[in-house]
Every structure is written in structure tokens, then in C-alpha cells.
């Protein structure tokens, strides 16, 4: 038997070979084996062995036809019969017909995801007995029943997620006997009573429901379907439809005759559902005459019910609200839309801008009959406390009526635009209880400290509502302090603007509600058994007593404030607390069982009001009218208000005491009340004395009645009259217990705020003197700018310094107490902040300038071809002195404008304490410290270098170039020209010591003035009086110092004043440039001295060169005298040596000579007595330097001068000062011009400042040229004038051409003029 078996085993390989070839051909050709047709284009056929141990005929096939946009399932004959997996996902298959997959009996997995399947016929999956996995995810399946899944007996996993059905009916999966996993998550899944069967079926069949959660109702959203408790799966109202919409869904604006179709669709959840149409609550049915057509209800895909409405001919009556109404036994639901029908000639509402407390709204041009909507402005804070869904857009609406006019509007859904109002609204929405009432009240109290800045009526209304809520808890023992906090809040509200309080009273009776809440505080507190209750605040004082009617002998109560009568802040700030936070500024009560006022005299107080209750208040007649509680014990309340702000008259009060708001409350308001009594006691007078805070006319005594003007309240004068009145006090008498006050007509009068708006007279007087002195300095330095010898930088610094001190003083005396106007007060704070910082910065700039001049070193010669450095602009000083304060103030104001102005605890205009530390006190202290360091450095430098006394001028650019070009010719010029320095070389008349003294004392006096002024306005009596006088003394000292230092002690300023006030005394200034008359025929020719030193100073000059060139010689007065008289000439080698001991006394006593008038004529030959070429120029320069300085004090006369006959009539301090200055300049010349052996060293040893006097005057030195005549007049009014026959600034060169320096007359004489003791030849 074995061999046949072996033979059979050997016969198998020939049979397997054809089968393998057929399978290979099927794979390569893409066709199905076993006679199957080819796959459609784009499909992929994948066949591979299932396993090594499986028979050859049991092959597995996978067909993938994904993303081919197939519109229907492929015919079964196009697929291999042995297909195991069929992928038809991501196509456009819309329906599955009966027998769509017949013949695929081996199919185990069918994937139909992401198609458009909406209809599945029963038996669609018939023949798929081997199918184990079916995926119908993300289709449009709405109808599911058991017949659909008939024949799927081996189906293990079914996925129906992402379809349209909202519920599954019982028995849907009865034919799926092998089902183990199920998914049916949809966007419309409704977990109600219709899926209760699912819980039982899942447990019985042991089915796993994956990733399926409830979507509706909202209460079960996101809960697993099988995890919901069965008792929650109900079909009770309200009805929540998974899908319900109406198109169009928004308001429709149409014209008459138009056609408008509507559609309404809802989730089909019950068989009795129906859709109805309504217009303005009336049911709508088909009416062909009016063009209305209603389609019957239609069921779509077993999931939606729909209905349609068509209005084919719209008329004006179609305007209204149209709705789609879904009706079921489980409840109803409605969707509506507005229809506006317009005529052909419709009108429009114009565009309009509305600004209110909810924001800025710009309404567009809108058709008549249309309601316009605008989105509210979103704010980050408080957005969660407004009504509506936070996800919804909150909008304001406004209706435009048919006439084209804006009508109703609504902004209630919008947040308040103002931060203050928004926060107060948040307070108002907070839930209150006994635990958090006190804490919330304290938070509100802290916020109402800024009540003076309230700008919206809703601010006051919200606070009034909060006070009413707090009042409910005042009766509780745990909330004892709540009453005190309520009084403080009401006191802060009195700081608000009267207009805001008036609007709040008119809108919601807010002020009256606050007062009535305060009246109930004492009632609740005394109900607990207490006999006395009192609470005080800056603007309100409350006192309550339990009084026995028996033995009552009357009572006098006084309202006072613990400040001195001379305290000027006692009347204006209306009870603001003082900076230390104590309550000395608050109102207080003091009562005494007496009916006389004299026994209640209080020291150091301001009595605001007093009230006298007579002994007959509890007479036997009244005792019967009263309703006693606890054996004839009565609760007496007294409330005092600093002013009448909480009692505004809002209605038509023409017939009342205020006479249509013509009269105003000008006194405090005092309230008297006995609990349980509200009757007029016509026969019992109550005397009230009130202090007036304003002056007016037509005074009327009045009492407040809360019931007048429909509950708005008003003042009436019935039963009240005035007993006595003087300038400040008014006594009235009323015959009822009420709120008492005095009203006056303030037309043309202002609030009596003398103590608030006026400082002490000493402050004003001394400040005016300081302002006048500063103004005099500013005007003098601006008007006489060209005559005052001061550098341009120093001039700018001094003028700006004076201006900012002037600005500080003006703003201080004029605005420091203007606390009633918030805007003005803020402006005062900003200006004071700026001017103070600017002043100390300009002092610092001045100190830095002095330091640079003191430490300045001599400049060396530079290459003539090298361009000079660019000039540094004056703007840099303004950027420091004015720019830095502007930046600091700008940042402070931009951060919070409320940093400036009056604080609630300060009766002056300045800054808040915290911002001022970093924005003012810190920078000001640092700048002051830097200034002091500069002053100390200058002082040390001057001690080390006592020779540095004056500030010298800088050579101009042209002078520097000329000096560099003339270096080779210096040996040919008189050495006197190298060392010639006069007062014209001074840049500033003041010495460095004087400038240092001026800057340091200015800073010291300014800081002292600022501090004393601040103390004078911030402290109370008597310290404010003391510092007012100290301020005055400092101000006078400051004034005297400024005028003396910057004006009186300066010769140039004094000269300018003399020229302005006494023009006749300055006649010489007119003669300065006048040429003298010809003297040839009068005086003849002056004698000549050929061997004089005047001749010897002109070296190496021929006759022709002397005639035709402008090289010229410089002759001092002494040289000119020597030229006239050879016997009196100085020896050549006997030049006196000048050392550091050169003083005014030595110069005046060493040489005393008088040189007669001199006239020099040109001569043709000048050869005799010429100096030797090898003569030392250093000795000559030294000699001429000393002679030049001597020449300053040698009195001479010039022929033809009007002053040559005036004697020296005055020798005083001014002349001594001038001589000392010239002596110093001579010393400085000698220091800068040491003896030189040859001309080759001139450039390296001579500073540029010394060469400044050898170059011609350039265009940049016009200011110095303008100053010279004035200086000549000042120095020569008391003596004759020297004569110099050479040009002071050296030869003039222009384009290589030389010309005569001065013209001559017909006789050849030189025309001489007076110019700084010199005559130009």
C-alpha cells in the first residue's frame, strides 16, 4: 500500500503548478480568479495566503476602492467572489439598495465611512453571512430598523457614529446575534425615555458601547449613554430639540409686493410632532387671496420634520413677528423672525452719535421702521456680571420709527464705560449676608473716598442701594460697626458734585434714600437696649438718646468741629480728614440738659449749628399723642449734615422755599426726630442756630419734607421763620421736628470760601515783592541784553532760572488752595511739579557751566587748514532744564492723572504721596545733591587756583585763522599787541567767586522758600501762621539778594538803568563815534621828538611802507607823551617788573602823570632813533604791558572831546573795583605771555586767548562791539581819556590789499575818536 501512496504523493506537484500560475496571472492582470471580471479603474486587489497551513483554495482577497468619488456601490459581478475585505470609504455613495453585496459570501469586513449614505433598503446586506465588521461612520443615515441588518448573523462590531439620527428604536439590532461592540455617537443624540431599552439590552447581550455620550438634554451632556441613571432618562418637559432652525433666521426688510419664503426644520423625535406657523401670536394657514401658502409637514430621512411658508405678495400688514412653532405632547418650541415691510418711498433716521455711561455709540443711517443694533464696547473687568450668555455678543439697539425719527433704545446689556461705575455695579451685584456685610461695607468705604471724582448719577444710585442693603444687617449684634461704616460712606458721598447728586435724586431718589437709611441706624442700635448711640464722620454727625418724658427740662445740642477759628481750611474742604488720618476735622455733637447756649462754650472749635429743644416738648398733651415704648421712654435722634448736598430740589419747586431753585442751602442741615412721632407741634418752638457758609440775599428759614413733589422731597418755609441774622450766624425758629436749614439767593455772589481760597496776607505781600524783583531782573536782562557784559550761556541760564522761580511763585500763591475745581487743582499740581524740577535743574546747569569755566585749560594752536569744531547748540541746556521736567510730569500724568490735584485728606493742590516720592522728592533731592557737589568742586578749584577770577572770552573762528596766518609776522609787530587785555576781554563781569555765591544762595533760598510755603499751607494753627511769616522773611531775603547780586552790584546793569532813566547823563555815548574838528589851524603842529619811544616801537619800517601800508604801530598814552617831549621819555631798559603783588595801590602810587592833549601828523621820513633789530622783544613786551596797565589810570584828554575839560569828581568803590579788575587782567596777561626770545616760539607759547586782541573784529563779535561804547562811558565819566594811535586788534588784512586805517583831514592830521582809551590810526 505504501507505494501507491507514494505515487499519489508524487502526483500532487503537477496539479499545484497550474493553480499557482493562475493566481499569479490574476495578481498581475488585476482581474479576479475563477472567472471574475476585472476591477474598476482605481481599485486595488490584494490577495495573499492566509497562512502556511491553509489549503490552497482558501485564499484571502482585499479590494480597496477608496476616494474614487463613486456614486453607488460597485456591482457584485465586478468584485472577486472570494473578497474578504472591501474598502469603499471617502466616496459619494448615497444609498444602499437590496442585494448590493450579493455573492460576497466570504466578505468579513466592509468599510463605508465618509460617504453620503442617507437611505439603506431592507436586505441591503443580505448574503454577507461571514461579515464581522461593518463601519458606517460619518454618513447621513437617519432611519434605522431591524430589517436593514437582516442576515448579518456573524457581525461582531458595528460603528454608526457621525450620522443624523437622534435616537434608536427598540429592536433595531435584534438580528445581530453575534454583536459584541457598538458605537453610535452623533451630534444630535438625545438621551431620553426612548433609549431606556438600550440599558437592558446591553446588559443582557453583554454588548460593549464605545465612545458614545449624550448630547441632549444639556443636563446630561457628555455623559456616557450606558452610564446615565435610568431615572434621568425621561420625556418630561421642557422640550429640547437636537436640531431646530428656521430660514431665514434674521430680521427681514422687504418692500411691498415682494415674495418671501420660509422653511422650518426640527428633529423628529415623536410621531405626534407637527409644525405650525404664527404671525404675532395668530396661527397662519394657506390663504391664496393674500398670497400665503403653507406646506404640510414632511418627514425627511426619519430624523427631521419640515414645513414651508411662502408669502408671495407682501403687504404692509405683513409687518410683524413670524414664528415656526413645533408642537408635541412633550412640550413646544418656537423660532421667530421679524419682517419689516417698507413703502417704496421709505424715510430714514439720520446718523447720530450717542455718548452715555455705557460708551460711545455711532448709530448709522437707518431705514424707517428698522431697529438698529450696535455691538457693546468690551471691557476686561466686570464682564462676567452682566446678564446673558457670555458667549453671546452683547448689543445695544435703537428703533427708527416710520416717521424717520429715532425712538426707543436699550443699552442695558452693555457694560458701563467708566471704571468707577463698573466697579460700583460689581459691588451692587454682590450677594450680602451677615458674614460678609461688614467686610464688603469697608471695601465700599475705601472706594468712595474718591467720591469727589464721581461723574455719573449711577455711581450715587449704586452706593445708595448698597447702603440700603447694609441697613438690613445693622440690627444684628454682630454688625455693630456697620452703622459707623454706613455713616462714613454717606459722608464721602457728600463730596460728590452737586450736579451728580441732583441727577441721582431725580432718577432714583438716591439722596433721600441715603438720609432715610441713616435715620434707621439709630433706631436699630437703640432697640438693643443701649441708651446712647453716636457716630461721627467728616461731613455727618449722628447722635441718639433714650429720653424719659418725666423730668425733661430741655436740651441744647451743639454741632462743632475741632479746629481753630483761624484755620482757613475749616470751611472749604467740608470735613476732609487731616493727613495723619485722625478725626480732628470731623463733625461732633455735644448735648447738655439745658436750654441755654452759653453754657456750652467750647474752646478751639468752629460751631456749625446748635438746636434747643424746649422743656414743653413732652407736655401732657403731647404725651397722649406719643406712642410710648417701655414706660414713657422715647428715642431722640439728631443728625447734622455739613451742607445741603443730600437735599437737592429736583421737581417743580416754584411755590416752595427755594422758589424754583433760585435759593440755595447756605448752612448746615440739622435733623431732629423722635421715633414714632410725625405730627406738627405748632405750639412748641424749636430754636436752631446755623452758621452760614455763603453770603447772599433774601434769606428764608425752611425745613425738608420727604413727601413733597411725588416723593422727590422739597424745602418748605411753613412754620419756620428767622429770629436773628448777622454776617455769619442765623437763628431760626420752627414749630415741628424736621430737617432745618437756611436758604438764600446766591445770584451774583460766590461761596464764602475766604478761609479756603486765601492765604495769610504776609504770604501775598512778600510774594508780590519777590515777583516784582524777579520781573525787574528778567526785563533788565532782556531789554538791555546788548549792554550787559555776560556770556550768552549765562544769560540764558539766568533768564530761565528767574522765569521758573517766577512761575513757581505765581502758581503757588494763586492756585495752591483751589481745591474746589478738580481740573484747576490738577493743573496747579502739574505746573508746580514742573517748575520746581526745572528750577533746580537750571541751577545745576549754571553750576556746571561755572565749573567748566573754572577748570578750563588754555587751548593750543591748531592747524589753520584744520576746520574748527562745530558750535554746540544752546538747545542742550533747554533739553536738560525744561525737557527732563516735562518728561517726568508727562509720565506721571499719563500713568494716572489723579496723581495730581487735591487729595481727600489735604486742603491744597499738589500730588498724591506715593507717586510724589518717585516723581518729585526723589529726583529733586538727587538734583540738589548733584548741585551741591558742583558747588563744592568749584570752591575747591578756586582755593587751589586763586589767580582764576574772571571768565575770558573765547576767540572767534576768524580770529583763530588770522592768528595762525600771522605767526610769522609777530616779530615785526609791537609786542604790546600780544599782551593787550582790557575789560573788553571779560566774558562776565562777575568773578567766579561771585557767580558761585549767586548760584548757591539761589538754590538755598529757593529750597527754603519752597519748604516754608509747603508748611504754611499744610499745617494748622498756629504753625501755619508761624511758617507764613517765615515764608515772608525768606521771600524778602530772596528778593533783596536777587536784585543786589544781579543788578545793583553790576556796573553794566547800573549803566543801563542810568541810560534808561536819565538819558542826559549818557551824552558821551552819543559823542563816541563823532570825529573831532580839524585842529591844524588852531593848535598848530605838535613838537616832535625823534628819539622818543613812540618812534622806537615802529621797527623795521621804511618811510614808504609807513605811508602806504596799514601795518601801523600801537602807541600807548605814555609813548605818545614821550613823542612830544623827549626829555620825559622812559628809559629803554628800565621797565618796571610786575609780580604777583601787583595791586591797585601799587599801580596808583608808582606812576602818577598827566599827559597833555596830543596831535600826531603823518611824516614822510621816520628814520631817527629806530630800535635795534637784536633788541630783546621779551623786555619790550613786559615794559609795554606794564605801561599799558598804567595807561588805564593816567588821565589824559583828547582834543575836540566834550569831556576833556571835566574834572575827576568821583573816586569811589566803583573806580577801585575797575582798577582791581585791570590789575588782575594785567597779571593774567603776563602769565599767558612770558618773555619770548624769538618769534619762532610765538605759536607754541601764546594761548589763543592772548591773540584774540591782535585780530580784527569779526562778524561774530557784534555783541562785544555794541557793548564797547557803554563801557567807555562808565569808566570815563570821572576822568579824561587816553589816546592810542594804533589799532587795538592789530592789522586788517583783506584779500592781500592794504588800505589806510583812518582818513586824514586836509592838513594831514589824524582824526581821532574815543574808544576804550585808544585811538585808531
UniProtKB/Swiss-Prot annotation:
Residues 242-340 form the Ig-like domain. Residues 701-750 are annotated as: GPS. The keyword Membrane applies. It is found in: Membrane. GO terms for biological process: cell surface receptor signaling pathway; G protein-coupled receptor signaling pathway. The chain crosses the membrane at residues 762-782, 797-817, 827-847, 877-897, 920-940, 997-1017, 1025-1045. GO terms for molecular function: G protein-coupled receptor activity. The lineage of its organism: Eukaryota, Metazoa, Chordata, Craniata, Vertebrata. Residues 583-750 form the GAIN-B domain. Keywords: Disulfide bond, G-protein coupled receptor, Glycoprotein, Immunoglobulin domain, Leucine-rich repeat, Membrane, Receptor, Repeat, Signal, Transducer, Transmembrane, Transmembrane helix. Pfam families: 7tm_2 (PF00002), GPS (PF01825), I-set (PF07679), LRR_8 (PF13855). The keyword Membrane applies. Residues 1073-1083, 1233-1250 have a biased composition (Polar residues). This is Adhesion G protein-coupled receptor A3. InterPro entries: Adhesion_GPCR_A (IPR051963), Cys-rich_flank_reg_C (IPR000483), GAIN_B (IPR057244), GAIN_dom_sf (IPR046338), GPCR_2-like_7TM (IPR017981), GPCR_2_extracell_dom_sf (IPR036445), GPCR_2_extracellular_dom (IPR001879), GPCR_2_secretin-like (IPR000832).
Amino acid at each position: 500500500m505504501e507505494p501507491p501512496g507514494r505515487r499519489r504523493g508524487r502526483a500532487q506537484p503537477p496539479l499545484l503548478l497550474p493553480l499557482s500560475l493562475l493566481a499569479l496571472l490574476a495578481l498581475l492582470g488585476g482581474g479576479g480568479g475563477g472567472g471574475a471580471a476585472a476591477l474598476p479603474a482605481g481599485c486595488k486587489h490584494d490577495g495573499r495566503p492566509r497562512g502556511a497551513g491553509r489549503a490552497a483554495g482558501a485564499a484571502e482577497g482585499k479590494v480597496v476602492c477608496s476616494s474614487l468619488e463613486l456614486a453607488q456601490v460597485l456591482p457584485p459581478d465586478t468584485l472577486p467572489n472570494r473578497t474578504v475585505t472591501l474598502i469603499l470609504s471617502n466616496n459619494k455613495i448615497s444609498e444602499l439598495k437590496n442585494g448590493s453585496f450579493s455573492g460576497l459570501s466570504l466578505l468579513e469586513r466592509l468599510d463605508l465611512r465618509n460617504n453620503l449614505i442617507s437611505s439603506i433598503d431592507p436586505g441591503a446586506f443580505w448574503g454577507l453571512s461571514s461579515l464581522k465588521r461593518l463601519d458606517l461612520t460619518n454618513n447621513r443615515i437617519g432611519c434605522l430598523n431591524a430589517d436593514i441588518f437582516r442576515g448579518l448573523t456573524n457581525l461582531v462590531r458595528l460603528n454608526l457614529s457621525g450620522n443624523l439620527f437622534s435616537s434608536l428604536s427598540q429592536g433595531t439590532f435584534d438580528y445581530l446575534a453575534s454583536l459584541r461592540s457598538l458605537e453610535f455617537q452623533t451630534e444630535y443624540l438625545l438621551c431620553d425615555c426612548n433609549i431606556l431599552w438600550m440599558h437592558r439590552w446591553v446588559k443582557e447581550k453583554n454588548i460593549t458601547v464605545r465612545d458614545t455620550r449624550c448630547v441632549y438634554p444639556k443636563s446630561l451632556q457628555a455623559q456616557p449613554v450606558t452610564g446615565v441613571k435610568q431615572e434621568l432618562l425621561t420625556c418630561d418637559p421642557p422640550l429640547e430639540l437636537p436640531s431646530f432652525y428656521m430660514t431665514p433666521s434674521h430680521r427681514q426688510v422687504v418692500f411691498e409686493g415682494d415674495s418671501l419664503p420660509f422653511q422650518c426644520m426640527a428633529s423628529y423625535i415623536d410621531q405626534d410632532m407637527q409644525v405650525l406657523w404664527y404671525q404675532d401670536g395668530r396661527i397662519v394657514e394657506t390663504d391664496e387671496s393674500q398670497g400665503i401658502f403653507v406646506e404640510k409637514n414632511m418627514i425627511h430621512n426619519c430624523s427631521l420634520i419640515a414645513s414651508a411658508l411662502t408669502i408671495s405678495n407682501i403687504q404692509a400688514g405683513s409687518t410683524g413677528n413670524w414664528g415656526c412653532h413645533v408642537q408635541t405632547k412633550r412640550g413646544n418650541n418656537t423660532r421667530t423672525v421679524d419682517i419689516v415691510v417698507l413703502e417704496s418711498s421709505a424715510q430714514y433716521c439720520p446718523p447720530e452719535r450717542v455718548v452715555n455711561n455705557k460708551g460711545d455709540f455711532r448709530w448709522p443711517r437707518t431705514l424707517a421702521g428698522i431697529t438698529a443694533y450696535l455691538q457693546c464696547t468690551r471691557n476686561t473687568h466686570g464682564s462676567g456680571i452682566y446678564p446673558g450668555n457670555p458667549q453671546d455678543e452683547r448689543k445695544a439697539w435703537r428703533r427708527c420709527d416710520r416717521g424717520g425719527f429715532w425712538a426707543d433704545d436699550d443699552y442695558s446689556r452693555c457694560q458701563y464705560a467708566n471704571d468707577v461705575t463698573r466697579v460700583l455695579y460689581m459691588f451692587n451685584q454682590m450677594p450680602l449676608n451677615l458674614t460678609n456685610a461688614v467686610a464688603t461695607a469697608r471695601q465700599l468705604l475705601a472706594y468712595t473716598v474718591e467720591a469727589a471724582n464721581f461723574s455719573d448719577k449711577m455711581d450715587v444710585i449704586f452706593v445708595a442701594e448698597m447702603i440700603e442693603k447694609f441697613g438690613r444687617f445693622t440690627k444684628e449684634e454682630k454688625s455693630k460697626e456697620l452703622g459707623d461704616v454706613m455713616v462714613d460712606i454717606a459722608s464721602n458721598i457728600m463730596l460728590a458734585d452737586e450736579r451728580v447728586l441732583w441727577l441721582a435724586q431725580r432718577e432714583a431718589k438716591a439722596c433721600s434714600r441715603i438720609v432715610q437709611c441713616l435715620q434707621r441706624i439709630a433706631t436699630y442700635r437703640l432697640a438693643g437696649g443701649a441708651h446712647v448711640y453716636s457716630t461721627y464722620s467728616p461731613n455727618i454727625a449722628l447722635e441718639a438718646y433714650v429720653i424719659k418724658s418725666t423730668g425733661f427740662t430741655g436740651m441744647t445740642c451743639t454741632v462743632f468741629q475741632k479746629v481753630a477759628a483761624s484755620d482757613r481750611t475749616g470751611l472749604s474742604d467740608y470735613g476732609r480728614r487731616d493727613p495723619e488720618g485722625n478725626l480732628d476735622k470731623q463733625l461732633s455733637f455735644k448735648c447738655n440738659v439745658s436750654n441755654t447756649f452759653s453754657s456750652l462754650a467750647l474752646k478751639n472749635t468752629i460751631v456749625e449749628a446748635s438746636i434747643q429743644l424746649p422743656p414743653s416738648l413732652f407736655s401732657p398733651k403731647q404725651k397722649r399723642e406719643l406712642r410710648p415704648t417701655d414706660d414713657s421712654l422715647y428715642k431722640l435722634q439728631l443728625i447734622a449734615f455739613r451742607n445741603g448736598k443730600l437735599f437737592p430740589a429736583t421737581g417743580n419747586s416754584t411755590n416752595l422755599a427755594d422758589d424754583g431753585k433760585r435759593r440755595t442751602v447756605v448752612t448746615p442741615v440739622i435733623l431732629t426726630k423722635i421715633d414714632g412721632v410725625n405730627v406738627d407741634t405748632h405750639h412748641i418752638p424749636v430754636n436752631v442756630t446755623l452758621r452760614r457758609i455763603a453770603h447772599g440775599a433774601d434769606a428764608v428759614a425752611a425745613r425738608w419734607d420727604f413727601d413733597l413733589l411725588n416723593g422727590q422731597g422739597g424745602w418748605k418755609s411753613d412754620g419756620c421763620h428767622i429770629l436773628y441774622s448777622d454776617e455769619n450766624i442765623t437763628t431760626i425758629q420752627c414749630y415741628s421736628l424736621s430737617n432745618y436749614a437756611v436758604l438764600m439767593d446766591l445770584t451774583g455772589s460766590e461761596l464764602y470760601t475766604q478761609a479756603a481760597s486765601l492765604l495769610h496776607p504776609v504770604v501775598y505781600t512778600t510774594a508780590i515783592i519777590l515777583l516784582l524783583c524777579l520781573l525787574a531782573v528778567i526785563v533788565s536782562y532782556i531789554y538791555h541784553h546788548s549792554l550787559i557784559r555776560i556770556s550768552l550761556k549765562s544769560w540764558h541760564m539766568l533768564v530761565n532760572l528767574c522765569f521758573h522761580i517766577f512761575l513757581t511763585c505765581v502758581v503757588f500763591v494763586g492756585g495752591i488752595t483751589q481745591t474746589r475745581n478738580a481740573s484747576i487743582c490738577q493743573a496747579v499740581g502739574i505746573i508746580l511739579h514742573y517748575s520746581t524740577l526745572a528750577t533746580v535743574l537750571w541751577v545745576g546747569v549754571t553750576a556746571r557751566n561755572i565749573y567748566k569755566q573754572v577748570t578750563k585749560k588754555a587751548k593750543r594752536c591748531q592747524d589753520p587748514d584744520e576746520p574748527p569744531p562745530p558750535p554746540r547748540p544752546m538747545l542742550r541746556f533747554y533739553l536738560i532744564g525744561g525737557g527732563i521736567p516735562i518728561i517726568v510730569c508727562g509720565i506721571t500724568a499719563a500713568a494716572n492723572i489723579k496723581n495730581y490735584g487735591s487729595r481727600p485728606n489735604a486742603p491744597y493742590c499738589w500730588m498724591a504721596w506715593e507717586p510724589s516720592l518717585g516723581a518729585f522728592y526723589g529726583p529733586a533731592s538727587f538734583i540738589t545733591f548733584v548741585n551741591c557737589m558742583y558747588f563744592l568742586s568749584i570752591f575747591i578749584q578756586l582755593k587751589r587756583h586763586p589767580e582764576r577770577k574772571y571768565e575770558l572770552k573765547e576767540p572767534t573762528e576768524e580770529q583763530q585763522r588770522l592768528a595762525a596766518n600771522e605767526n610769522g609776522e609777530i616779530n615785526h609787530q609791537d609786542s604790546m599787541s600780544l599782551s593787550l587785555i582790557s575789560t573788553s576781554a571779560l566774558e562776565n563781569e562777575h568773578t567766579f567767586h561771585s557767580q558761585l555765591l549767586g548760584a548757591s544762595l539761589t538754590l538755598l533760598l529757593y529750597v527754603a522758600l519752597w519748604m516754608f510755603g509747603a508748611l504754611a499751607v499744610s499745617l494748622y494753627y498756629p504753625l501755619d501762621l508761624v511758617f507764613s511769616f517765615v515764608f515772608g522773611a525768606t521771600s524778602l531775603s530772596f528778593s533783596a539778594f536777587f536784585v543786589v547780586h544781579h543788578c545793583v552790584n553790576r556796573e553794566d546793569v547800573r549803566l543801563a538803568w542810568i541810560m534808561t532813566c536819565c538819558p542826559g547823563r549818557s551824552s558821551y555815548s552819543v559823542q563816541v563815534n563823532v570825529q573831532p574838528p580839524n585842529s591844524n589851524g588852531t593848535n598848530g603842529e605838535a613838537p616832535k621828538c625823534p628819539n622818543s619811544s613812540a618812534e622806537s616801537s615802529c621797527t623795521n619800517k621804511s618811510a614808504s611802507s609807513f605811508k602806504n601800508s596799514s601795518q601801523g604801530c600801537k602807541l600807548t598814552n605814555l609813548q605818545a607823551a614821550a613823542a612830544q617831549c623827549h626829555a620825559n621819555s622812559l628809559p629803554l631798559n628800565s621797565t618796571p617788573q610786575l609780580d604777583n603783588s601787583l595791586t591797585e595801590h601799587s599801580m596808583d602810587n608808582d606812576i602818577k602823570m598827566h599827559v597833555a592833549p596830543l596831535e600826531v601828523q603823518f611824516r614822510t621820513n621816520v628814520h631817527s632813533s629806530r630800535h635795534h633789530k637784536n633788541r630783546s622783544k621779551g623786555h619790550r613786551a613786559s615794559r609795554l604791558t606794564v605801561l599799558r596797565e598804567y595807561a588805564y589810570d593816567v588821565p589824559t584828554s583828547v582834543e575836540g572831546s566834550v569831556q576833556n575839560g571835566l574834572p575827576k569828581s568821583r573816586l569811589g568803590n566803583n573806580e577801585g573795583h575797575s582798577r582791581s579788575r585791570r590789575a588782575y587782567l594785567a597779571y593774567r596777561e603776563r602769565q599767558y605771555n612770558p618773555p619770548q626770545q624769538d618769534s619762532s616760539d610765538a605759536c607754541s607759547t601764546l594761548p589763543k586767548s592772548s591773540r584774540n586782541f591782535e585780530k580784527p573784529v569779526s562778524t561774530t563779535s557784534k555783541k562785544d562791539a555794541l557793548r564797547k561804547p557803554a563801557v567807555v562811558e562808565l569808566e570815563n565819566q570821572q576822568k579824561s581819556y587816553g589816546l592810542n594811535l594804533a589799532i587795538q586788534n592789530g592789522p586788517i588784512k583783506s584779500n592781500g590789499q592794504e588800505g589806510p586805517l583812518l582818513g586824514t583831514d586836509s592838513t594831514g592830521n589824524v582824526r581821532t575818536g574815543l574808544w576804550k582809551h585808544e585811538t585808531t590810526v
